[in-house]
């Protein structure tokens, strides 16, 4: 039952602080970290509102992604997706590997395979080991994506990782292409324009010494392309630009889809 006095609440907070301390000590084992820089806080509030309030002027908010199936994450939403949409600071969502998708995938495979012989689904093994995977940033030439690019550069520098800059484009993302003001540009012309946008971004960038940067433009919807890229990345960084409100829930903004379905850690930059 809920505590009914100030003394009871004080005891609850004390117990929570002890549990947090035990958890942190275990999680930080083997990490070069000064405990003096750590502050433990417990509040009685919904996760989203509490983290937004505590983290409103922080460098970033970091959370783990809840273990729901893909369908449940789309239908019910998640704390991490809500934070990524509402926060004014970068939100990093650490993917915690789980077996829920693998179990459902195996059930689907068995349901659709003729005969009675069971089908066993095995998660494909990554081509590149995690320690060598790049930081990937999705850009589109907008101011928000420029901030995402700057954030990704710093992440790559801190972790001594290569940075891969991706522009996943469709013709509507490219604006008016010279010579095609009243016509639909061919894909090869769009590809050339997308590569020009990437080149313009890189020309203005200040690349830290030692950071290896590569670029690619792909003719594919941003959410689909970046989720595919997440299978080969250690960290995926995107801007928050996209749909909002009812349309975002039913159609899905790029950032919401990536937070819910990416296969690596994701940061959404505002």
Which ranges hold each PLM region?
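Acidic, proline/glycine-rich short linear motifs
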Residues: 1-21, 101-124, 167-196
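A short helix-to-beta-strand connector/capping loop
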Residues: 29-39, 207-214
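Structural alpha-helical scaffold elements that stabilize or flank donor/cofactor-binding regions
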Residues: 51-54, 83, 128, 229
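Protein-protein interaction modules outside structured cores
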Residues: 179, 188-196, 214, 224-228, ...
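Charged docking surfaces used in two-component/phosphorelay signaling
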Residues: 42-49, 217-224
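Small/aliphatic-rich secondary-structure junction motif
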Residues: 1-10, 124-183, 235
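Intrinsically disordered or low-complexity boundary/linker segments at protein termini
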Residues: 35, 59-60, 65, 81-147, ...
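Glycine-rich, Arg-bearing micro-motifs that act as flexible, cationic patches
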Residues: 63-86, 100-107, 235-260
């Amino acid at each position: 039952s809920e505590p009914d006095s100030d003394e009871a609440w004080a005891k609850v907070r004390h117990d929570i602080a002890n549990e947090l301390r035990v958890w942190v000590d275990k999680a930080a084992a083997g990490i070069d970290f000064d405990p003096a820089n750590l502050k433990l806080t417990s509040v009685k509030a919904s996760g989203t509102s509490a983290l937004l309030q505590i983290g409103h002027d922080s460098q970033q908010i970091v959370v783990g992604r809840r273990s729901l199936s893909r369908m449940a994450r789309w239908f019910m939403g998640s704390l991490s997706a809500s934070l990524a949409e509402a926060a004014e600071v970068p939100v990093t969502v650490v993917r915690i590997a789980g077996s829920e998708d693998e179990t459902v995938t195996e059930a689907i495979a068995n349901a659709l395979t003729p005969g009675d012989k069971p089908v066993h689904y095995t998660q494909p093994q990554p081509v590149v080991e995690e320690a060598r995977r790049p930081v990937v940033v999705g850009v589109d030439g907008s101011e928000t994506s420029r901030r995402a690019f700057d954030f990704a550069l710093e992440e790559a520098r801190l972790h001594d990782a290569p940075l891969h800059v991706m522009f996943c484009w469709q013709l509507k993302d490219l604006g008016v292409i010279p010579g095609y003001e009243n016509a639909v540009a061919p894909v090869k012309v769009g590809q050339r324009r997308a590569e020009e946008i990437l080149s313009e971004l890189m020309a203005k960038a200040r690349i830290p010494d030692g950071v290896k940067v590569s670029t690619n433009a792909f003719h594919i919807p941003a959410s689909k392309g970046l989720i595919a890229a997440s299978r080969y990345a250690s960290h995926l960084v995107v801007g928050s630009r996209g749909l909002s409100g009812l349309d975002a829930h039913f159609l899905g903004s790029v950032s919401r889809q990536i937070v819910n379905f990416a296969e690596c850690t994701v940061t959404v930059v505002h």
